[in-house]
Design a protein with these regions (language model features):
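Membrane-embedded helix-loop-helix hairpins and adjacent transmembrane boundary segments
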Residues: 1-489
């Protein structure tokens, strides 16, 4: 039976967890004195909080639902996604984190990614900022909706309630503590949620192995009923492997992850944060992959019915553990959803308040008004994402992959070149961003090649950046700022 009936212990653990997150939001509510506090936490985040916050905000409900579900359906071939993500995240921490932290604080006090791009390319016309803001609002609205779908599936499966009621409940919880607490609340809850996610992902596959009779026995069952699931290459085309590995390219352009680099206390904290972040990620991704593979064996051995593969973690948590423990483990999904959705809502709100209203329409606006506009932005994006999420048949992985590709192609290419090529120009950045986003949208909707849209999007954007930059002039001051950044490394 896929859905376990609602019981008091699981309900109590969910309520306790949700109240804890809301308390953290209330606690930091009065500490937000200005927009920099609300959007970047005053740049006071230490290495542990920065690393776990980056990881938790990155992974979302996809880590506990989308990825195990993908491996349950397709087998180890989809583990290339995890490999690509680990490589991409490592490169992001090693090559991007320090340069971005220096640029956004030493060169100019940039609070948002559009802030950074405008300063980096001396864009006094605000064209780049507007393009950035539009891309962020479009793709983050889809990204937030994936989190809301995950939350709705969680509540629906756990409590047996209707999808629309489940969707409404999850949305209210996520919006409430983001609305109140701002960046510090998001980072502190991310740290707690990151630890909870890792604990759950380690415990569940270990208990599954115990019930299956060990790793060898589990693999024998999988080999007997679905041998192709254990192959990472047999019968799989190179296009599929490239597409899976290409997920790593997306890291260079994810605003909700990049702001973690901007808010870290000091560049001296980055090496430790890098180690913690990558170690956390490797453990979580490996464990999530194993849940999917072991799920194949468990469902077959115990003759279970699983209509939705993305619920394999939920079903295993309900079946294998005492209801009180199951409540804690299932709270890990809520943690993953809340950590990512709240970070994305915060970036979206800063885009509306800082990048649209303050920078374009009224630069002398008082900080407390920017703060309030940011909170209204949280509500606006959440409402639109809620409407997108009303289709209960939506795939979490499909929605995430689209938004991930959009940011990776449009922002990722521009971010990478902006930090490593002093000759890059404002025109190159604008055209690269537009063509990257447009290529993703067109490829997703009209191409049937099987190639993940981030690959052509990133490549086209990179070519456009190089050509446009070589045929246009670098604006005065940008080279000097670039050289200043290099001296600070």
């Amino acid at each position: 039976m896929e859905v376990v009936q609602i019981n008091t212990p699981i309900a109590v653990m969910f309520v306790v967890y949700a109240l804890l997150m809301l308390y953290i939001g209330f606690y930091f509510y009065k500490q937000n004195k200005n927009s920099e506090d609300y959007f970047l936490g005053g740049r006071t985040m230490g290495p542990v909080i920065s690393a776990l916050s980056a990881g938790a905000s990155d992974m979302s409900g996809w880590l506990l639902m989308g990825l195990p579900g993908a491996l349950y359906v397709s087998g180890f071939i989809d583990s290339y996604i995890a490999i690509g993500l680990t490589i991409g995240a490592s490169l992001n921490w090693i090559f991007v984190a320090k340069r971005l932290r220096i640029y956004t604080s030493v060169i100019a006090n940039s609070l948002t990614i559009p802030d950074y791009f405008e300063t980096r390319f001396d864009d006094d016309k605000h064209i780049l900022r507007i393009v950035c803001a539009v891309v962020i609002l479009i793709f983050f609205t889809f990204y937030v909706s994936s989190g809301l779908v995950s939350g709705a599936k969680l509540f629906e499966s756990t409590f047996g309630i209707r999808y629309d009621y489940a969707l409404t409940t999850g949305t209210i919880i996520i919006v409430a503590y983001t609305f109140l607490g701002g960046y510090k609340a998001v980072c502190w809850t991310d740290m707690i949620q990151g630890l909870l996610m890792m604990m759950a992902l380690i415990i569940v596959p270990l208990v599954m192995l115990y019930h299956l009779g060990g790793f060898g026995e589990a693999m024998n069952i999988v080999r007997e009923i679905k041998p192709q699931a254990l192959s990472m290459g047999e019968g799989v085309g190179i296009i599929s492997i490239i597409s899976a590995l290409a997920w790593g390219l997306g890291y260079f352009g994810q605003p909700h992850i990049l702001v973690r680099f901007m808010s870290i206390r000091s560049t001296k904290d980055i090496p430790m944060a890098t180690f913690i972040g990558i170690a956390w990620m490797a453990v979580c991704l490996l464990s999530a992959c194993m849940i999917g593979i072991l799920g194949i064996a468990y469902v077959h051995k115990f003759e279970l019915s699983l209509q939705d593969p993305e619920k394999i973690f939920i079903v295993m948590s309900q079946l294998l553990f005492n209801p009180w423990i199951a409540g804690i483990l299932l709270s890990a999904i809520l943690a993953a959803i809340m950590s990512t959705a709240s970070s994305q809502l915060l970036v979206s709100s800063s885009t509306i308040a800082e990048d649209f209203y303050k920078k374009i329409f009224r630069e002398d606006v008082p900080s407390h008004i920017v703060l309030n506009l940011g909170k209204l932005g949280v509500l606006l994006v959440a409402v639109i994402a809620f409407l997108i999420s009303t289709d209960k048949n939506s795939s979490v992985l499909s929605i995430v992959s689209y938004a991930w590709a959009g940011f990776g192609a449009s922002f990722g290419s521009v971010m990478f070149f902006s930090l490593f090529w002093s000759r890059m120009t404002r025109v190159g950045a604008i055209l690269g961003m537009i063509t990257g986003a447009a290529t993703v949208v067109l490829w997703k909707n009209f191409a049937n090649s099987g190639l993940y849209e981030i690959v052509p999007g990133f490549l086209v954007a990179s070519v456009v950046i190089i050509i446009a930059s070589l045929f246009t002039n670098v604006r005065s001051g940008t080279k000097a700022a670039y050289e200043k950044m290099l001296k600070e490394l």
